[in-house]
Amino acid sequence: MPPKKKVTGLIKLQIQAGQANPAPPVGPALGQHGVNIMEFCKAYNAATESQRGNVIPVEITVYEDRSFTFALKTPPAAKLLLKAAGVPKGSGEPHKTKVAKVTWDQVREIAETKKEDLNANDIDQAAKIIAGTARSMGITVE
């Protein structure tokens, strides 16, 4: 087994699927760690091509020889809720002004999508986490 490479950095970014390019925020974040920016952009775009239209968080691990690996996460719950509710953004005053409604079925569907990234034992707990996110955005769950 080859010796383990030493990790020099961990970068977390949220990028539109299939649309990574060297412009900010991607370029400067990767440039600081000496990563080949175009190589990452091509690999990320290829990996997320099927999910166009979503924001896909990515965790990039940079090694001392300037190589890197990356792990894709599920889209942020807030973005999935906005899409389900059909509104462009959440409420400025979530506890006073409600902007939309989503059903429990939609919340459960989002929880299914996000299950691997959530700290929940079962789908009901995951749905409660998503419902809490909805509440803090001014979206009513029925």
Swiss-Prot record:
Description of how the protein assembles with itself and partners: Part of the ribosomal stalk of the 50S ribosomal subunit. Interacts with L10 and the large rRNA to form the base of the stalk. L10 forms an elongated spine to which L12 dimers bind in a sequential fashion forming a multimeric L10(L12)X complex.
Q: Which GO terms describe its biological process?
A: translation
- Keyword Cell membrane, does the record have it? no
| Database matches in SUPFAM superfamilies | Ribosomal L11/L12e N-terminal domain (SSF54747), Ribosomal protein L11, C-terminal domain (SSF46906)
The signal peptide annotation in the UniProt record is none
Q: What is this protein called?
A: Large ribosomal subunit protein uL11
Post-translational modification summary for this protein: One or more lysine residues are methylated.
Give the GO molecular function terms.
Answer: large ribosomal subunit rRNA binding; structural constituent of ribosome
* NCBIfam families found in the cross-reference section: L11_bact
Q: Which UniProt keywords apply?
A: Methylation, Ribonucleoprotein, Ribosomal protein, RNA-binding, rRNA-binding
The similarity annotation says: Belongs to the universal ribosomal protein uL11 family.
The domain of life for this entry's organism is: Bacteria
Q: Which GO terms describe its cellular component?
A: cytosolic large ribosomal subunit
Give the protein's biological function.
Forms part of the ribosomal stalk which helps the ribosome interact with GTP-bound translation factors.
